[in-house]
Amino acid sequence: FGESCIAGRFIVPLGQQVTDQRDCALYKCVNYNKKFALETKRCATVNLKSGCKTVPGGAGAAFPSCCPMVTCK
């Protein structure tokens, strides 16, 4: 695959990033101390406080717009 990283069903070229809309994640292939590394960003896990609820992110939206949001009264 040349200079790239593999993230599940994605091949990410070195220095580029790919959004996984199905799993709401962002993958970036970087050169870290002469080794390829895959940086992965996903939605944060939240603990809801009283009076708060989660609102789903945009269906099919790119990361981070696909992440759920917390709204409180």
UniProtKB/Swiss-Prot annotation:
It holds the Pfam family SVWC. InterPro entries: SVWC_dom. Keywords: Amidation, Disulfide bond, Secreted. Expressed by the venom gland. The keyword Cell membrane does not apply. It is found in: Secreted. SMART domains: SVWC. The modification Lysine amide is found at K73. Contains 4 disulfide bonds. One of its GO terms (cellular component) is extracellular region. It comes from the Eukaryota. Belongs to the scorpion La1-like peptide family. Is the most abundant peptide of the venom. Not toxic to insect. This is Venom peptide La1. It comes from Liocheles australasiae.
